[in-house]
Design a protein with these regions (language model features):
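Conserved anion/nucleotide-ligand pocket segment
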Residues: 1-70
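Generic secondary-structure signature for well-ordered alpha-helical cores
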Residues: 2-6, 18, 40, 44, ...
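Short acidic (Asp/Glu) and glycine-rich catalytic loops that position anionic groups and cofactors
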Residues: 46-53, 92, 127-132
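Generic, ordered loop/turn and secondary-structure boundary motif
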Residues: 53, 65-66, 76, 123, ...
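Fold-independent oxyanion-binding glycine-rich loops
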Residues: 3, 10, 42, 67-68, ...
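C-terminal active-site/capping subdomain that shapes the small-molecule cofactor and substrate pocket
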Residues: 105-197
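Oxyanion-binding "anion nests"
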Residues: 63-102, 106-109
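Glycine-rich phosphate/diphosphate-binding loops and the adjacent beta-loop-alpha structural elements
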Residues: 55-59, 96-103, 129-136
Length: 197
């Protein structure tokens, strides 16, 4: 058995940085309270996330794979796309996708999710962990960040944990891509317990 490490989400997050020419390395401007949104398939959990406990919370284990959708979607179907091989190698562990986006608007997020789905990337998926997009709160013609992801992820009838501390809106939890992890959501927070093996 390998060494076990644990990381959890943060209480607050930064919607707008105080970084400027005169202050290139400011402290975080933590103005927003983290509120996770959790779905099973395309339906939101009935138990409020902050009331989830060890019995009613989300608990799932598997291999982590993912990153920034802006970059990943450009690899689908190319000679650098080894996702199918990774998925097949770790199918017995199951796959937990962690994804976030930087410059994609909500329509581009939906297209990226569709493209990854059609490339077979979500085979053996056990859960999705979705970070806050840089376009947090954007709504375009009735499409928001949640429905953009759920259009693809919701089909798999697995937990979809959204607004997680990942990606381009800090702070971000360290994620070890390829690691095996036990993921839990309880009392309004997410915890990743890594098992290095």
């Amino acid at each position: 058995m390998g060494k076990k490490l644990s990381v959890s989400g943060y209480d607050m997050w930064e919607k707008e940085s105080l970084k400027n020419e005169d202050n290139p390395t400011p402290e975080y401007n933590l103005t927003e309270k983290k509120i996770l949104r959790c779905f099973y398939g395309d339906k939101e959990y009935e138990t409020p996330v902050d009331e989830m406990d060890s019995d009613t919370g989300i608990h799932v284990s598997g291999r982590l794979i993912g990153g920034c959708m802006d970059c990943l979607v450009n690899l689908t179907g190319t000679e650098y796309d080894y996702v199918s091989e990774f998925n097949d190698k770790y199918k017995d562990d199951g796959i937990i996708w962690f994804l976030e986006s930087c410059d994609l608007n909500v329509f581009a997020i939906r297209r990226a999710m569709w493209q990854m789905e059609k490339a077979g990337w979500f085979k053996h998926v056990k859960a999705f962990i979705i970070g806050r997009p840089l376009v947090f709160g954007q709504d375009m013609m009735g499409l928001d960040q949640y429905s953009a992801v759920l259009a693809a992820a919701g089909k798999y009838k697995v937990p979809v944990i959204m607004d997680v501390d990942l990606g381009h809106l800090p702070p971000a939890m360290p994620v070890i891509s390829g690691a095996y992890a036990d993921v839990s959501v309880e009392k309004g927070n997410i915890t990743l317990n890594y098992v290095l093996r």
